[in-house]
């Protein structure tokens, strides 16, 4: 039973000492053990806390949780340095390991701390992370950090194409070229067939008779006038 008394429960026991005449040793021992179990069930602090995707008015904070611990949520404390802007983001019933920070002031310094939420409460705050938002005209993130702060990871807005993406683009272009070539070939075949099916027009004159007169034409007779004298 003495093993149930953790070191951080000494203060609690000391605070209950004035009431010891009214409390039995068994009650004091149960209270101390319960406090020790509550502290033991709290999850550990997050690790590998980083800030990425820096923009003028937003950023993304991510972290990891040690394996073998039950975590049901997180709590993020955001503080703007040299100005108002404190915010606490809390979410439970989630297993996410990242959170977007929005509504930030451009070209300003911020610090964030992440806590894990377990079944018996929150963990101690994780390491304090410092980052600086970009200016409105900046495209590349500035990786400014104070001594002792965790280095902020910045990502470029324009990333190079991956090998798989290049292969897909080349395949699509080749397919389009093949379709266009097949269409042109079919068009030439159809055009040749149409030209072969049309009868050739040959100029034929009217048939001539052996005497050089057109056949099938009647020779016009000159009018004859008969005069009868009485």
Swiss-Prot record:
Residues 193-205 have a biased composition (Basic and acidic residues). SMART domains: FN3. GO terms for cellular component: endoplasmic reticulum; extracellular region; extracellular space; plasma membrane. Residues 1-40 form the signal peptide. SUPFAM superfamilies: Fibronectin type III. Keywords: Glycoprotein, Membrane, Secreted, Signal, Transmembrane, Transmembrane helix. InterPro entries: FN3_dom, FN3_sf, FNDC_type_III_4/5, Ig-like_fold. The keyword Kinase does not apply. Residues 41-163 are extracellular. One of its GO terms (biological process) is response to transforming growth factor beta. This is Fibronectin type III domain-containing protein 4. It comes from Bos taurus (Bovine).
